């Protein structure tokens, strides 16, 4: 029974995402993207974990590459974007769908939707080696026509220069406790990125 419920739940998540993608171009005609900065994240919670201070400062248009068809995590992502006051879009990919052509297709499409002067995403090595993060980072590097930033990797992020002030750390922790409650394990498992953030210029 649990498997059936889980299957129906995921199908509903896919349907909602697919309908959103179908009608999103219509909303763009009514309300074109004015942001000059675009941020690509692989999954829900990557936004807060890796790009909290960047989002507060730059106010980017945020693109979620993979919803994973999870209604819970989609709801959490929308709540996070509302907290930051950011415009966003999301796409119908499984959380582990690492097909390069699919990822590149999404990124290419989104890059044509605004006149962006700054692009930001994951590093080519996926921060700690996450394959989906890697592929998103590589695709952004390949396709971005403008200045591009990526996350600092695990072997460098622990330095003092990337350590956040205590109020910023507390805010990130509270965002997970209040919004990304399904991902609370992140606070322990990826603690270094809770307390540190860093971006570096992408060299081509």
Which sequence ranges carry the predicted segments?
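Active-site beta-strand->loop->alpha-helix modules in alpha/beta enzyme cores, enriched
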Residues: 2-145
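The feature marks non-catalytic terminal segments
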Residues: 118, 147-204
